[in-house]
């Protein structure tokens, strides 16, 4: 996949109507946005366009309204908050059919530097099916397209891919540019040693990632629930820990592949365990084995030290997925240890979105990382070596 895409700085935007696909898929509680990370992420692109005299038409999805106009998925609160953040009115076009009379009127009346936000694109069924009609309607509003929603770059939808058939030029905003730079460099030309850390519950979610990264990394660290499938493959006892029985053979293949490629594959050498899936006091095991009746819920202190050492020696580190049950205070230690080691490392440190990003932000290490990806699913597919349709659809430099 070509990562060298045209950006908003490569096109003339003054006086032009510019459709921008943002990622405003933010959590709401009682109509108030509870996490503004994605709004903050979109600001540099929106401000650049406003400051350079573009007429800015924003669009995004939120949640899964499944093709129906459900008020709880309305982008009205986003328009309100964006107005406050920009210090100027963001006109909200509240059309249930997204590109309706309100949108057309608002867009027709725009002056340079004005901003309009369209209603949730997933109010229309065809959005997720990449239907021609909505793609054409969105394209008809503007003279060029900017994609700045990395979080949906792995989806071929109307507002990410379909619209580019009818609207050129199609370029990326600052957010996607930054994602492509950090993730692209890490995967294509990393500074070595290159260490990848994978956690989370299931091996099945990360099969292609493990396979692809074993071709590229010097060290692969595995924690979280998926470690138990690997330990079982090595013949250790795992008690009542989460194991994907149908993936034990696959784990054996990956262990063999790591050896063949000369990749260090690090697995837990001790665990924090409990008798039930609850936030109870942790029992620390002596070694890799977990006794009958106990389940592994986090990596142990010896493992933390080994993982931290590997991170300390690295020049590029990429992390996706927690080391244990991060929501339980007794079992968040491994995740904290990895986050801390990355924060202190003299390396390019990349967090692959999702749970790891949330953990790093909660722990206050966010500003110590080189890059926190805004797309969990998209960054995983990127690490699998897949082409992301939303990126592929943009014009090359």
Swiss-Prot record:
EC number: 2.7.2.3
GO biological process: gluconeogenesis; glycolytic process
UniProt-annotated binding residues for ATP: 206, 296, 327, 353-356
Residues holding substrate: 23-25, 38, 61-64, 122, 155
Gene Ontology annotations for the cellular component aspect, listed alphabetically: cytosol
UniProt GO molecular function: ADP binding; ATP binding; phosphoglycerate kinase activity
Subcellular location(s) of the protein: Cytoplasm
Record keywords, A-Z: ATP-binding, Cytoplasm, Glycolysis, Kinase, Nucleotide-binding, Transferase
Record bears the keyword Nucleotide-binding: yes
Database matches in InterPro entries: Phosphoglycerate_kinase, Phosphoglycerate_kinase_CS, Phosphoglycerate_kinase_N, Phosphoglycerate_kinase_sf
Catalytic activity: (2R)-3-phosphoglycerate + ATP = (2R)-3-phospho-glyceroyl phosphate + ADP
Pathway as given in its UniProt record: Carbohydrate degradation; glycolysis; pyruvate from D-glyceraldehyde 3-phosphate: step 2/5
Complexes and interactors: Monomer.
Family affiliation: Belongs to the phosphoglycerate kinase family.
Protein name: Phosphoglycerate kinase
Organism: Clostridium perfringens (strain SM101 / Type A)
Name of the gene: pgk
């Amino acid at each position: 996949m070509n990562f060298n895409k045209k950006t908003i700085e490569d096109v003339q935007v003054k006086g032009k109507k510019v459709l921008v696909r943002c990622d405003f898929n933010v959590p709401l509680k009682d109509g108030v946005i509870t996490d503004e990370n994605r709004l903050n992420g979109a600001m540099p692109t929106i401000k650049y366009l406003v400051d350079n005299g573009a007429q800015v038409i924003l669009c995004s999805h939120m949640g899964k309204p499944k093709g129906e106009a459900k008020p709880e998925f309305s982008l009205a609160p986003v328009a309100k908050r964006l107005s406050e953040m920009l210090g100027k009115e963001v006109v909200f076009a509240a059309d249930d059919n997204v590109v309706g009379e309100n949108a057309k009127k608002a867009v027709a009346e725009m002056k340079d530097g004005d901003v309009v936000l369209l209603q949730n694109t997933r109010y229309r069924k065809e959005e997720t099916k990449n239907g021609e009609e909505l793609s054409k309607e969105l394209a008809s509003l503007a003279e060029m397209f900017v994609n700045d929603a990395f979080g949906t770059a792995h989806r071929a939808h109307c507002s990410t891919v379909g619209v580019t058939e009818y609207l050129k030029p199609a370029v990326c905003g600052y957010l996607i540019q930054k994602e492509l730079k950090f993730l692209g460099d890490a995967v294509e030309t990393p500074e070595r040693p290159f260490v990848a850390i994978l956690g989370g519950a299931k091996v099945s979610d990360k099969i292609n990632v493990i396979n692809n990264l074993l071709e590229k990394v010097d060290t692969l660290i595995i924690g979280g629930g998926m470690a138990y499938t690997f330990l079982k493959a090595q013949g250790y006892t795992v008690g009542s820990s989460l194991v994907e029985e149908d993936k034990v053979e696959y784990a054996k293949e990956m262990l063999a592949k790591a050896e063949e490629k000369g990749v260090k594959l690090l697995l837990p050498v001790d665990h924090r365990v409990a008798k039930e899936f609850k936030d109870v006091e942790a029992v620390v095991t002596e070694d890799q084995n977990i006794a009958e009746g106990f389940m592994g819920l986090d990596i142990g202190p010896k493992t933390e030290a080994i993982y931290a050492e590997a991170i300390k020696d690295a020049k590029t580190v990429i992390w996706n997925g927690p080391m244990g049950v991060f929501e339980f205070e007794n079992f968040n230690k491994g995740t904290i240890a990895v986050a801390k080691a990355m924060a202190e490392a003299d390396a390019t440190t990349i967090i692959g979105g999702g749970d790891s990003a949330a953990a790093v932000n909660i722990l206050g290490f966010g500003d110590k990382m080189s890059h926190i990806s805004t797309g969990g699913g998209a960054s995983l597919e990127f690490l699998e070596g897949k082409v992301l349709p939303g990126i592929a659809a943009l014009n090359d430099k």
